[in-house]
Amino acid sequence: MDSSLKTQEPQVVETSPSPVAQEPPQVADKPAIVPSPIAQEPDNDVPAPGNEFAEFAAGCFWGVELAFQRIPGVTVTEVGYTHGISHNPSYEDVCTNTTNHAEVVRVQYDPKECTYETLLDLFWSRHNPTTLNRQGELLGAQYRSGIYFYTPEQEKLARESLEKEQKKLEDKIVTEILPAKKFYKAEEYHQQYLVKGGMHGNAQSPAKSCKDPIRCYG
């Protein structure tokens, strides 16, 4: 038989496997902000014996806290978040501008040494109450102007002081005056931030009646 008539063996051609398309890495979504009725509860914390609470929102809480620390009769200051929709928010949560919390300073003061009116006077002097959700270049609901009262007397004095302050200004005051709701203490590094040196490591004095200018970032 002619060898040319032999059945040809099939040739096997080796091929490289087709590259598998690589999916982009999955980025975990941030947890959604979940509204909680707990955030709407009243502030039921109790001040030290002989003291009363007062609470104010006047922009970034660092400089506002130091100003209140310097008032004779103020015994304790804390910075935190309130009047938002979520329970136990972090600073990062608040900065998303989705929780509606305000940055606040909660003050304990001895009414025998310091009047609520004194605290109100400082509040008005520390910020611009006519800019909605804004203080200077700081934008967002966390920087809004607010007075959060603990007693009917505080509410009365707050509203009277607003009327008095409005007469001095051409623009309309947008300060909210509302009952104090649940207070969420801010992270420890925010507490007495400027006294500890602030952003630049330059400690500022909390001494009573100190008149040194307050540098908002340290």
UniProtKB/Swiss-Prot annotation:
<comment type="function">
    <text>Catalyzes the reduction of methionine sulfoxide (MetSO) to methionine in proteins. Plays a protective role against oxidative stress by restoring activity to proteins that have been inactivated by methionine oxidation. Prevents cellular oxidative damage in long nights. MSRA family specifically reduces the MetSO S-enantiomer.</text>
</comment>
<feature type="region of interest" description="Disordered">
    <location>
        <begin position="1"/>
        <end position="30"/>
    </location>
</feature>
<dbReference type="GO" id="GO:0008113">
    <property type="term" value="F:peptide-methionine (S)-S-oxide reductase activity"/>
</dbReference>
<feature type="modified residue" description="Phosphoserine">
    <location>
        <position position="205"/>
    </location>
</feature>
<dbReference type="InterPro" id="IPR050162">
    <property type="entry name" value="MsrA_MetSO_reductase"/>
</dbReference>
<dbReference type="GO" id="GO:0034599">
    <property type="term" value="P:cellular response to oxidative stress"/>
</dbReference>
<protein>
    <recommendedName>
        <fullName>Peptide methionine sulfoxide reductase A2</fullName>
        <ecNumber>1.8.4.11</ecNumber>
    </recommendedName>
</protein>
<feature type="compositionally biased region" description="Polar residues">
    <location>
        <begin position="1"/>
        <end position="19"/>
    </location>
</feature>
<dbReference type="GO" id="GO:0033744">
    <property type="term" value="F:L-methionine:thioredoxin-disulfide S-oxidoreductase activity"/>
</dbReference>
<keyword id="KW-0597">Phosphoprotein</keyword>
<dbReference type="InterPro" id="IPR002569">
    <property type="entry name" value="Met_Sox_Rdtase_MsrA_dom"/>
</dbReference>
<dbReference type="InterPro" id="IPR036509">
    <property type="entry name" value="Met_Sox_Rdtase_MsrA_sf"/>
</dbReference>
<dbReference type="GO" id="GO:0005829">
    <property type="term" value="C:cytosol"/>
</dbReference>
<dbReference type="GO" id="GO:0005886">
    <property type="term" value="C:plasma membrane"/>
</dbReference>
<dbReference type="Pfam" id="PF01625">
    <property type="entry name" value="PMSR"/>
</dbReference>
<keyword id="KW-0560">Oxidoreductase</keyword>
<comment type="similarity">
    <text>Belongs to the MsrA Met sulfoxide reductase family.</text>
</comment>
<keyword id="KW-0963">Cytoplasm</keyword>
<dbReference type="GO" id="GO:0006979">
    <property type="term" value="P:response to oxidative stress"/>
</dbReference>
